[in-house]
Amino acid sequence: MKNKPLVSVLIPCYNVSAFVERAVNSILKQVYTNLEIWLIDDASTDDTAEKIKSFDDNRIKVVSFAENTKKVGAVNEVLQNVQGDYIAFQDADDWSEPARIKEQIEQFLIDTELGICFTNYRYAGDKTGLPEKISLTDEELKNEFLNYSYTRVRGTSPTNCPTMMISKAALENTGGYHPYFAGRVAEDIQWIYRILKRFKGITIDKPLYNYSLREGSFSYIQSNGDNAKYAYSWPLLSKIIYKDVHEKIDVLAHENINLLKELELEACEEALIESLKLVNKMKKTYEKSASYRLGRFLLSPWRLFKNKEF
């Protein structure tokens, strides 16, 4: 490859001491070497900061934050200082295959109108294997993100946002993550939505990224029930995108704060109804199980004794 533009790789880190070396080494071992690698410690409480400072490579830049920003604030600040013509992302508990950056750069050099490029991925950890089907073409990606609907994409294998590489033009045009989504599950999707409104996208149909959902990860913490924002973030995102696409209303604009609050309440309501439906479904499934029927049978004499009048 004669033309070798600089690629900035951002690796946000929070309490990932046990995994971060694998993630960073997967970038250091990329066959494409013209990189600047930003290791971003978002106020970890373990020894993550010490781990990332121990790497000895002149391509690495370490940035540490005194207060946790839920990833969004830290990444946005670093994005203001990147020098790369293209920007790639790597989650600190995942890892990339050696050819990932090279393959993505080649796509940008082929198509100068490209603003964002993803790759296929492989599940690692408790769940293994490849996703069943993902969006590959610009048309498919736009259908996934510009017509985003939580109820439509549930049960599918969505595009894996951490695999994305974007052009500097896409960054300058969209500005990074919206601060409203700090600590929510949808921060990547909302930003990608804004990029795909203005630029072409593509997914390389090769598993060049290894994705792990582990207990303690940011994704796990968001989805395990401890984070109240998780329950309604998806339906809320659907409403925000719908308003923007069909009614040309930027719900996140300051002047629309009251509308945002209304949509938050609606999303909470919908999430609660969905949760109750799920609980009811689980209850019915359990009542059909052999263990439930056996329990009822074993307890039937006690119920007769309890109800008997003396």
Q: How would you name each of these model-derived features?
A:
Residues 18-21, 46-54, 95, 99:
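Acidic helix N-cap motif at the loop->helix transition within catalytic regions
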Residues 65-82, 103:
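Glycine-rich, basic loop-to-helix element that forms the pyrophosphate-binding segment
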Residues 87:
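Short aromatic/hydrophobic "clamp" motif used to bind/position activated sugar donors
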Residues 243-310:
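Boundary detector for helix-to-coil junctions that initiate low-complexity/charged tails
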